[in-house]
Amino acid sequence: MIPGEILTEPGQIELNVGRPTLTIAVVNEGDRPIQVGSHYHFAEANNALVFDRELATGYRLNIPAGNAVRFEPGMRRTVELVAVGGERRIFGFQGKVMGALK
């Protein structure tokens, strides 16, 4: 074994199996690139991103942990979101939830 090496079982690793997902269109109407990380509550992302925030409440990007999606100015992109897991409580970000999701 090499120091720092990670050994995994053979086959593909499936992420977020069985969790609700949704696909939404997002447009960056700002003048600067915006990056959103894998575990950021998507409904509270930068206000220059235009999308259905009510629909996205309780969801995050369906991408591997530690990754991010970049939205260039004027760019329209479709992203897949996945429901937040665990106790489904959200704190911080823009402070719009601050507790349990409904």
From Swiss-Prot:
Enzyme category, top tier: hydrolase
Listed pathway(s) = Nitrogen metabolism; urea degradation; CO(2) and NH(3) from urea (urease route): step 1/1
Task: Tell me what reaction this enzyme catalyses.
Answer: urea + 2 H2O + H(+) = hydrogencarbonate + 2 NH4(+)
Q: Which GO terms describe its cellular component?
A: urease complex
Q: State where the protein is found.
A: Cytoplasm
Reported EC number(s) for this entry are: 3.5.1.5
Q: Which InterPro entries match?
A: Urease_beta-like, Urease_betasu_sf, Urease_subunit
Gene Ontology biological-process annotations? urea catabolic process
**Which superkingdom is the protein from?**
Bacteria
Show the stretches that span the lipid bilayer: none
Q: Which GO terms describe its molecular function?
A: urease activity
Q: Where primarily located? A: cytoplasm
Query: What does the record note on quaternary structure?
Result: Heterotrimer of UreA (gamma), UreB (beta) and UreC (alpha) subunits. Three heterotrimers associate to form the active enzyme.
- Recorded family membership: Belongs to the urease beta subunit family.
Stated name of the protein: Urease subunit beta
Species for this entry: Bordetella bronchiseptica (strain ATCC BAA-588 / NCTC 13252 / RB50)
Coding gene? ureB
